Amino acid sequence: MTEPVVTRFAPSPTGFLHIGGARTALFNWLYARKQGGKMLLRIEDTDRERSTDAAIKAILDGLNWLGIEWDGEVIYQFSRAARHREVAEQLLAEGKAYRCYATPEELTKMREAARAEGRAVRYDGRWRDRDPSEAPADVKPVIRLKAPQTGETVIEDQVQGRVVWQNENLDDLVLLRSDGTPTYMLAVVVDDHDMGVTHVIRGDDHLINAARQKHIYDALGWTVPTMAHIPLIHGPDGSKLSKRHGALGVEAYRTMGYLPAALRNYLVRLGWSHGDQEIFSTSEMIEAFELSGIGRSAARFDFAKLENLNGHYMRASGDAELVKAFEDILQFLPQGPALQAKLNDTTRAQLLQAMPGLKERAKTLLELIDSAAYIFADRPLALDAKASAVLTPQVRALLGELRSSLANVTDWNAANTEAAMRAYAEKNNLKLGAVAQPLRAALTGRTTSPGIFDVLAVLGRDDALARLQDQAA
């Protein structure tokens, strides 16, 4: 019987959950769900100077917002330091590791000499076979692994294929620092083993770590997990992802008005494919996800593609669902408190009524909020420059007449207000646009808006007529 699949997402809490980390978490989660296994969450907080509680909160919030659920309690790596030291001492006792008394000055000279000679920088093993009796009394040692010095180290990677390193190019890595704290390399191996991790899915910037970590696994006689090193995400031009390209924290995408389902769908297609399918529900992702579908080349981040995909999800979302999303995002926006204060039973009902038209036009929640601004506008409306230019004295006189025509509409809805407008335009030999544009400017303060008949219906008779009165001559 095969053992159950256990994956892990193991971020360092030194910053927000960036977009590459979010994709790594998603791939781990999808693979675990596809295989009926578990995804664990381990916070690698051994760098005590750079790890922050704010970053931990941002990581947990980001995963929750994206709908990526981990199994069990969050594991904090630093809390396991005693276990890591125990393993280092075990290797020392078994003769598979040794105390190294090289001073920082010696190591600096070693590095400088290697660079001057054009050699790779690596520890030269000077304390590997020396008698401990030669140890200087005033130097606290580190503990180093006795790595193999000949032959090769091979990783059969599920994405990169067979990757081979010559052992002569890999040095004796530090397991325990001179202050007794474990290194990242040791902590990761011990934690993955103790947590029963069967598959390590992470960025290919960790590929060299895989070779070095395999040396630790082999020294301990532990099974090496299946490895899958996924390509990094690049900008649209193929360069390293920068903030202008999209190298932002997940919380920034939330604030920019993207829906979690859309971002999840976009991320799964960054470097993974399943035929030519672009749109995936969560259940479809889980059903289709295989490590073999991950490509070896870097994926390119494309904001326009994300925006279009988000637009698709906006249009496919239920109206009430979008009203909730509208409210949820306000806490993250500068104008949020002012809008929140205006949300009441009336404006919520208007927003829900307007939503079919709003979501057809908006690609993000920010665009949706902007298009819905007329619902929350205070009278008399502030007009933008284009709307002011439309409302000439002659047009303002027209608005007064148009208001009188609309005031005769008893059953106030989009169809009846449209009929009244068309009748007015026909009676006065005007094109519909010559009536609709001034109406739009007076009702919304802008020259672009959702369908003007929908605007009339959403505002209701009293508010619409009052806004027209405000602008009429």
UniProtKB/Swiss-Prot annotation:
Catalyzes the attachment of glutamate to tRNA(Glu) in a two-step reaction: glutamate is first activated by ATP to form Glu-AMP and then transferred to the acceptor end of tRNA(Glu). It is an enzyme of class 6 (ligase). A motif ('KMSKS' region) lies at residues 240-244. It catalyses: tRNA(Glu) + L-glutamate + ATP = L-glutamyl-tRNA(Glu) + AMP + diphosphate. GO terms for biological process: glutamyl-tRNA aminoacylation. ATP binds at residue 243. Belongs to the class-I aminoacyl-tRNA synthetase family. Glutamate--tRNA ligase type 1 subfamily. One of its GO terms (cellular component) is cytosol. It comes from Afipia carboxidovorans (strain ATCC 49405 / DSM 1227 / KCTC 32145 / OM5). The keyword Transmembrane helix does not apply. Its EC number is 6.1.1.17. Keywords: Aminoacyl-tRNA synthetase, ATP-binding, Cytoplasm, Ligase, Nucleotide-binding, Protein biosynthesis. One of its GO terms (molecular function) is glutamate-tRNA ligase activity. This is Glutamate--tRNA ligase. It is found in: Cytoplasm. Its main location: cytoplasm. A motif ('HIGH' region) lies at residues 11-21. NCBIfam families: gltX_bact (TIGR00464). Monomer.
